[in-house]
From Swiss-Prot:
It is an enzyme of class 2 (transferase). It comes from Schizosaccharomyces pombe (strain 972 / ATCC 24843) (Fission yeast). The keyword Transferase applies. One of its GO terms (cellular component) is mitochondrion. Belongs to the class-I DAHP synthase family. Pathway: Metabolic intermediate biosynthesis; chorismate biosynthesis; chorismate from D-erythrose 4-phosphate and phosphoenolpyruvate: step 1/7. GO terms for biological process: amino acid biosynthetic process; aromatic amino acid family biosynthetic process; chorismate biosynthetic process. Transmembrane segments: none annotated. InterPro entries: Aldolase_TIM, DAHP1/KDSA, DAHP_synth_1. This is Putative phospho-2-dehydro-3-deoxyheptonate aldolase. SUPFAM superfamilies: Aldolase. It comes from the Eukaryota. It catalyses: D-erythrose 4-phosphate + phosphoenolpyruvate + H2O = 7-phospho-2-dehydro-3-deoxy-D-arabino-heptonate + phosphate. GO terms for molecular function: 3-deoxy-7-phosphoheptulonate synthase activity.
Length: 368
């Protein structure tokens, strides 16, 4: 009998022949969603609050509520202390404008990158390239719970089919980004999420793929993911009716103006979709200059005040202090407090001024 090399535990004939994992450095175990949700459990009061925030967002998207849905906050969260201070301030504004605006805090934990860069708090919570994802998951859930305790709802972006198992019970509204709206995997994921989802137009400005994504995610799907116990499973969904498009501009130019909104409205109606449009004041619409966001918001406010009912939401990248900063390679203590480490944001004073403008626009729209 020919001699052969015995297989190591967890090895296979294929890996011995180097036909798999040839570019994999290693595998690290990850904590299960069930354990994290038990360790950092949400109270009944918190879950009831999340459900109510979702309902209000869905009602606005569907036209049953004439307020504007505002998704406002940092491009990404990197400092739990600053995030909580922002949430406390935002909650006061949410109460102040509750008759005209439904304000949810943008609390993004993962960042899609066009090339490379810091991928977010879950991926690298220590901002030092150590990629302690198990710590990142815990930090992320703890932050979400603390933000919700301030009395403000939270919004986040969906980047994969696994991380929502750890956090989705706390999210009030979700986004599928411009780079992933066309992805079948993300459309399948959206079809099973328990909260409203906004699909951004493509980076080239194409809104057709966002409408296609709405159609796809409204239907049932089957896809691979993991259970709360961390077991790989086939997920069967029922479809998500609470979806809408987000105009964020693109390489072809901005799309927040009245003509672009009218065109998007017509396209949605042509595809038998409810003309419900959120406009992103940042990204392509701001030409990647945060100082342009209030100008974009002013244009949106003018359209709303003039009676445009298709505009149901606005997204703003905002932080305690304006601008952005790079993550230092060595001394993290040198970082500025309340300043974004990803996209540049407008500061707090500009943010509250935009709230006033949009709230006034909603009141004017009611007279049409």
């Amino acid at each position: 009998m020919d001699k052969h090399t015995p297989l190591l535990p967890g090895d296979s004939v294929f890996s011995r022949c180097k036909t798999e994992d040839s570019r994999i450095k290693g595998y690290d175990p990850v904590i299960s969603p069930a354990l994290i949700q038990s360790e950092l459990a949400a109270s009944d009061e918190t879950l009831a609050f999340v459900s109510d925030q979702r309902r209000q967002a869905a009602d606005i998207i569907a036209g049953r509520d004439d307020r504007l849905l505002l998704i406002v906050g940092p491009c990404s969260l990197h400092d739990p202390v600053a995030a909580k201070e922002y949430a406390i301030r935002l909650q006061k504004e949410a109460i102040k404008h509750k008759k005209d605006l439904h304000i949810i805090m943008r609390a993004y934990l993962e960042k899609p990158r066009t090339t490379v860069g810091w991928k977010g708090l879950i991926n690298d919570p220590d901002l030092d390239g150590s990629y302690n994802i198990n710590k990142g998951i815990r930090v992320a859930r703890r932050i979400f719970l603390e933000l919700l305790e301030t009395g403000v709802g939270i919004a986040s972006e969906m980047l994969d089919t696994i991380s929502p198992q750890y956090l989705a019970d706390l999210i009030c509204w979700g986004a599928i980004g411009a780079r992933t709206t066309e992805s079948q995997l993300h459309r399948e994921l959206a079809s099973g999420l328990s909260f409203p989802i906004g699909f951004k137009n493509a980076t080239d400005g194409n809104i057709g793929i966002a409408i296609d994504a709405m159609n796809s995610s409204a239907n049932p799907h089957h896809f691979l993911s993991v259970t709360k116990q961390g077991v790989v499973a086939i997920v069967t969904t029922t479809g998500n009716p609470d979806t809408h498009i987000i105009l964020r501009g693109g390489k072809s130019g901005t799309n927040f103006d009245a003509d672009s909104v009218a065109g998007a409205k017509a396209k949605l109606e042509e595809c038998n979709k409810l003309p419900s449009i959120m406009i992103d004041c940042s990204h392509g619409n701001s030409s990647k200059n945060h100082k342009n966001q209030p100008k974009v918001a002013a244009c949106i406010a003018e359209q709303v005040a003039n009676g445009q009912k298709a505009i149901t939401g606005v997204m703003i990248e905002s932080h305690l202090n304006e601008g952005k900063q790079a993550i230092p390679e060595d001394d993290l203590s040198s970082m500025k407090y309340g300043v974004s480490v990803t996209d540049a944001c407008i500061g707090w004073d500009d943010t509250t001024a935009v709230f006033e403008q949009l709230a006034a626009a909603v009141r004017s729209r009611r007279s049409h």
